[in-house]
Amino acid sequence: MDAFGFLKVAAAVPHLGVGDCDYNTERMAALAEEAAQRGVEIAVFPELGVTGYTCGDLLLQSTLLDAADEAFGRLVRATRKLPLTLIAGLPLRHGTTLYNCAAVFTQGRVLGVVPKSVIPGYSEFYEPRWFASGAGISGERIDVAGQSADFGTDLTFEVNGAEFGIEICEDLWVAVPPSSLLAAGGAKVIFNLSASPEVVGKHDYLRQLVAQQSARTLSAYVYCSAGFGESSTDLVFAGNALIAENGRILREAERFSADEQLVVADVDLQRLEFERRRNTSFRQAEATPELTVIEMEVPEGLRAAALDRDIDPMPFVPRDERRRSERCEEVFRIQSHGLARRLRHTRCQKAVIGISGGLDSTLALLVAVRAFDFLGLDRRGILGITMPGFGTTDRTYRNALQLMRGLGVTVREIPIRDACLQHFRDIGLPPEDRSATYENAQARERTQILMDVANMEGGLVVGTGDLSELALGWATYNGDQMSMYGVNASVPKTLVRHLVRWVADTAEDGATRATLLDILDTPVSPELLPAEADGSIAQRTEDLVGPYELHDFFLYYFLRAGYGPAKLCYLAERAFAGSHDAAVVRKWLGVFIRRFFSQQFKRSAMPDGPKVGTVTLSPRGDWRMPSDAAAEAWLKELDTLS
């Protein structure tokens, strides 16, 4: 396990000869060597991989059982110099009883043996014909490969600080899998040795089962099933190998391959520890029988320079087009239903929204339109107010008007220049002073207009600020920070853009679609400073606070995974390789940390708004933080990277 908590694991599917133990263990040794070269720390082979699963009644023959034990002993010795831990399946006798077992070994030593608990005897499965259940066995020893090892279903293993547990095939398919108890007892990785034949539709179910069990146990789950080489007398084995982590499949093998396969992934034990700390329900899991933890230190092997793990630079936005469209539809529904519920509760039939021609106010308006349609209210009850100021450009002004007209809402225009100039005179601010007061006064003037119009009309002010702005505090306190209901408060900027594009792609009106596309093409800006001489936007948000794609990346992994600055940099430098170098990543991470801590007071007073995802900053919900917390520990860690 590396300094960031990544553990490199593998599911190894070797060539196999049914009953040919020498050949089978030779192939295992070869794959173990390959795994070591790739920096793997723990690798698992299929169920009964030493003999083959489909030996049938030959499993009762002493000749095969002796051959399996001898061949396994050679495998243990052949891999003794490899810096990794291996898990292999073989039949083992204990007294007069035969068990379907998983043996854990490293450095020439067998650490322990786990018997299969659930022995299936239905459909194509006849395991009770040969094997007994190992459920409940604890505190015993078993002879294997000339060694005596711990034997039982109460075993977990800790190698270089990484604790893992084992279950075998059918163990996963029951109401309470052993892995649930092992995880509750501390195991963060579960290895499953399997020999599961293919039938139509089973693979999809298996993928869901593995993913769900990893989510339910807040663990990494490494599943390795027998492949090409098992007998096809009545069954076909496709060589399924899956590595999942907390509900997400990280890697999987090619099915029905005639080649040996080594599926490798880095699983994030540090993140799993964080998830278990924050998940109070996991901590309340049913008490488990006392587990026996077998500890072992293994010499550090080859640590691959590249992570065997996909680092998504856009964690809020699905890459797959179909899933992205489904995500946008779901988010849009949550937003609009939240607003609809608030409108119905307050008996408001009017909504007031400031429309700037930018992304956030556009999304808020689209959400309001959907909410009004859902409630059967007249869209003219939506009062879209454009409030041109000192920095408003022709482009955003035009887009604001065209969008409102295209959607059929009530359009109002209330310029703020004169009111702001009068305010500057009242407080003694020279109009040429371009300080924060100059900018914030405009934002507060706009909010005052919206609030007063809402009072006049008996309406509700719909907030437009998004999650990214809340994280950075990129809003004027008691200005655009305030509303009566903030529909975008849980939507990050990177997702806002895709939501608007999704609406544009489905828009029936060509003019409205063209307006939405032009809004998408407009630089993000608060437009609080006068435009350039050519009329273009002078104030670009991402030039001032940094790229939103970086900030959303930091925000997601800081809140959702609990990563510190060092790990955030490590991952961001890989996720954004080719677009943002290390210096850029560290610069903007420093900005993110400083602003996130210093601007909490704005979030502490934020209005109500719907939660749409697992990352949100409502002080009444997912994020509790004092407004006067110090950022020094995080900044100090960041400084050590420079």
What are the residue ranges of the model-derived segments?
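ATP/NTP-dependent adenylation/nucleotidyl-transfer catalytic domains that generate, transfer
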Residues: 24, 160, 219, 231, ...
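Enzyme catalytic cores with a strong preference for nitrogen-chemistry domains
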Residues: 1-354, 370-379, 411
